[in-house]
C-alpha cells in the first residue's frame, strides 16, 4: 500500500467500527530503509495514533527474501530509530489508555498478576491489559472494572460492585 491508501483504509476502519482499537507491528532498519522511509513510518504512526504497537529491529531470518539483501542499516542507526519510534508509539498508547480513566469496562480475568500477588489481571474486549485489585475467584470470569490508572502498556482498575 502507499501511505495514502493505508490512511484511507485506516480511516475507513475508524469510521466504520465505533471504539475500534488498532495495533500494528513495525520493523525498523529493514535492508534499504532510508531516513526518508523511517520518517514516513513516523508520519503514519503520528497519523494513526495506534492503541499499541509491537516494534522490532530488523534481523536476518535465513531463507527469507530479505536474507539475500544487504543489511545496510548500521545497528546503531537501527537502535536510534527504534528508540525514536518507541517514544512516539508509547505516547499514543498512553493517550489511548488515558481515555479509559474512570470508565467502567468489561474484563476477562485470566490469572494472578506477576507483579503483585494481591492482584489479578485480564483483558478488555480491545485486548488492553488490566491489573485489578481482587482475589483469584475472579479468574475465568468477565467482570466490570472501573479504570483507576493508565500507563502506556496497561491499565489498573477496581471491580465495580
Predicted regions located by residue number:
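Conserved non-cysteine loop/helix-boundary elements of the Radical SAM core domain that shape
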Residues: 1-52, 60-77
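Terminal RNA-binding accessory module
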Residues: 68-161
